[in-house]
Amino acid sequence: MRTIKGEYIVEYYENGNICREEYFLNGKLHRENGIAYKSWHENGNIWSEQYRLNGKLHRENGITFKSWYSNGNKCNEEYFLNGELHRENGIAFKGWFENGNIWIEEYWLNGKRLTKEEFENRNNSSSSCNPEGKIVEIDGKKYKLSKIAT
């Protein structure tokens, strides 16, 4: 059974349990302050939750996409920004086997997958900055930076 109210849709399984809820704007999954798509397994356990803006997976501060196995165990958690896997302070994609053991953890920035080492070293100033020759001003005096042998 399907119930449509404006751009909000609810579907039910034949057994009467809720199947899914969807929020739309201009034909695209969209909800600014909440979950745009939520689904359940036929047994009534939650299946997935998705935050979307204009059809794209998007959430600035939190998990964007979550899913669970029919037994209630977590399946995956994903962080998206503007439709791309992205998380600046940790794992962006994490998945579990049905028994609850972790099977994958991935780091992503702006849709690009990074190794754990690349992610942890991305702001390492020693590898990305060469200040030699730069002029700095301290208390009105200018100084030219140079490398000191160690």
Language-model-derived ranges and their functions:
Residues M1-K142, K147-T150:
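Glycine/tyrosine- and acidic-biased, solvent-exposed loop/turn segments at the edges of beta-strands
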